[in-house]
Regions:
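Membrane-embedded beta-strands of outer-membrane beta-barrel proteins
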Residues: 115, 158-160, 206-210, 247-251, ...
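N-terminal periplasmic/intermembrane-space "pro-region" immediately following the signal or transit peptide
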Residues: 21-91
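Bacterial Sec-dependent N-terminal signal peptides
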Residues: 1-24, 331, 543, 549-553
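Outer-membrane beta-barrel translocator/receptor signature
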Residues: 80-84, 92-101, 105-143, 151-158
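Flexible loop and strand-edge segments within Gram-negative outer membrane beta-barrel domains
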Residues: 136-157, 161, 171-218, 228-246
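Exposed, low-structure sequence patches enriched in small/polar residues
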Residues: 96, 101, 298, 306-308, ...
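Surface-exposed extracellular loop regions of Gram-negative outer-membrane beta-barrel proteins
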Residues: 121-141, 258, 262-272, 277-308, ...
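Outer-membrane beta-barrel transmembrane domain signature of Gram-negative proteins
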Residues: 201-211, 222-295
Length: 553
């Protein structure tokens, strides 16, 4: 693995990138919302705030000609920084099934346990319960070529979501808890400063909200508020242990002008409070919009108006425009011109990489322009394709740098998170085909061109230049399917820096369904036994196997 040289080069970028981060704060894309259909239970939703508070924003989709598509979800890709993912298709509840359980185990002590149940207490009361555990404990490649290290990573999640329906509105209460324990990769340097080699993150949240349920009301609305907490148990090189607490509020109001037109406004507010060396501030995001939906044209015209009180305070604005045009029945041309502000809190950094560390507080990321144009089509039954291209500018974009600052003084490797102004242009194509439950395949490729401030090109070492993915699921015999996935990602090469090792992952698997509710599955991952680091900044597991069983009830 040639990656150690990349780490040392990137580590030297910390001082320069720190200066760049001080130039101001701002966002990327629209308000990040996960839309969940009101009466559909999704056992994969872990975040208590991922509920249907914001109005639904549909992505462009080519009209389907017939119902000959495969009915099952495609197999999931490999996890990045976390352990191998169980390959199961029961992510969507079928019919009246209320419960779901899954258990899988594999090499390197990969484990994946999950259970969920949706309980209709009465005709007006519903309770959703979910718990999961996943992780690994085994030897994986080290950045030092030929070496391995004992990696341990486990995460536990528990959530409760309750809803009571009144005549006009519904009351929602919920909460979630997560514990994430892991160790850092040792640096193998001698005579260095001794920092904790393990870490534990504790995440908690709770919310209360109301949402309109009478579709005859002139104004549809939803409002939700609650508290989110993220705590670090141990110090790292740059930050003492402590917590970040966020009072999070979101909601919307919308009304119909007529059957084709609607106006509305979305709101999201975060009040950040820290007991670590971070500055407190409030971010308020408003999203007024107008929508038109005709027979062949869909239009959304809006704006993101964001106000921040400190640490990059000021007023920022960005567009929120979407246009779709359907022609020849099955072709959709679309144009998106978006933007906005993104909060870079501890949760966001943890999603970026569990092994994250920061030399100074992250600014919010601001995207004044995120433009995309494309064409989606389904010219024949079962066949779909998309051509697309876009360009995005983000101030204070996040970049992962393996190793971090003063690598030679640390006894462990962190993944440093840095910020700089990032510009990326991209273009790609995707093709998919599905016929009944016999075969389902997809292939897609995207080319990226990234640019940052001159002198900070090393920040792009883990950014993709070319992504290519292929997946196929084919019936072998009745109720038995074989699966194959391939993921390739060539990294950016800038200036005289070496190109980081490419992501090169081939996986195969099989699954067998019993009694229309039990699924037995297995998968071999990283079949080529390649050694590379993901954007999370840590090496992946080598060749490994996982098998398990799941059941809907």
């Amino acid at each position: 693995m040639k990656y150690i040289s990349t780490i040392l080069v990137c580590a030297g970028l910390w001082p320069a990138a720190t200066v760049c981060a001080q130039n101001g704060g701002e966002k990327d894309s629209t308000l990040n919302r996960t839309v969940v259909v009101e009466n559909q239970y999704n056992p994969e939703v872990m975040d208590a705030f991922k509920v249907n508070v914001m109005p639904e924003v549909e992505e462009p989709a080519a009209p389907k000609q017939a119902i000959n598509y495969a009915t099952d979800l495609r197999p999931l890709g490999a996890w990045k920084a976390t352990p191998m993912e169980a390959m199961s298709r029961e992510l969507a509840q079928k019919g009246a099934d209320r419960g779901y359980v899954r258990a899988a185990y594999g090499t390197l002590n990969n484990v994946d346990l999950k259970g969920s149940y949706l309980w209709d207490i009465s005709s007006k009361d519903r309770l959703g319960i979910m718990a999961s555990l996943y992780g690994l404990n085994g030897d994986i490649p080290h950045f030092m070529e030929g070496e391995e290290w004992k990696s341990r990573f486990y995460r536990t999640d528990v959530s409760l979501d309750y809803r009571h329906d009144f005549r006009k509105v519904a009351l929602k209460l919920g909460g979630a808890f997560a514990s994430q324990v892991f160790n850092y990769m040792p640096s193998m340097n001698e005579g260095v400063e001794n920092w904790p080699t393990t870490q534990r993150y504790t995440l908690g949240e709770g919310y209360v909200g109301v949402v309109s349920r009478d579709k005859d009301l002139p104004i549809q609305f939803a409002f939700q508020t609650g508290l989110r907490s993220f705590s670090l148990r141990y110090d790292n090189y740059y930050m003492v242990y402590g917590s970040e607490n966020i009072f999070h509020t979101e909601g919307f109001m919308a009304g119909n002008i007529n059957e084709e037109q609607q106006v509305g406004v979305g709101l999201e507010m975060d009040n950040l409070i820290h007991d670590v060396s971070q500055q407190d501030y409030t971010l308020l995001q408003l999203n007024p919009y107008y929508t038109y939906q005709g027979e062949s044209v869909k239009l959304r015209v809006g704006a993101h108006v964001d106000l921040q009180t400190a640490y990059g305070s000021g007023l920022k604005a960005a567009p929120d425009v979407k246009l779709e045009y359907t022609f020849a029945d099955t072709y959709v041309a679309y144009l998106n011109v978006l933007g906005g502000t993104r909060l870079n809190d501890f949760r966001r950094l943890n999603d970026f990489s569990p092994y994250w560390t920061i030399a100074q507080q992250m600014h919010t990321s601001y995207t004044p322009l995120d433009a995309k144009i494309g064409l989606k089509a389904s010219p024949v039954i079962g066949l779909g394709f998309e051509l697309y291209g876009g360009y995005r500018i983000t101030k204070n974009e996040l970049f992962a740098v393996p190793g971090g600052f003063y690598t030679d003084k640390q006894n462990v490797f962190y993944t440093g998170i840095l910020q700089d102004k990032g510009k990326v242009g991209y273009g790609g194509v995707s093709v998919s085909y599905a016929y009944r439950d016999w075969v389902d395949f997809s292939v897609n490729g995207t080319y990226y061109s990234w640019n940052v401030t001159e002198g900070n090109e090393g920040l792009l070492q883990l950014k993709p230049e070319l992504k290519a993915d292929f997946s196929v699921r084919a019936k072998v015999i009745k109720n038995c399917h074989a699966l194959l996935n391939y993921n390739y990602e060539r990294r950016q090469k800038k200036a005289d820096l070496k190109r980081a090792d490419a992501i090169n992952n081939l996986s195969v698997g099989a699954e067998y369904e019993l009694l229309n509710r039990i699924n037995v599955f297995g998968r071999l991952n990283n079949l080529l036994n390649k050694a590379y680091a993901t954007e999370a900044g840590y090496p992946v597991e080598g060749l490994h196997f996982m098998a398990g069983i799941s059941c809907r009830f």
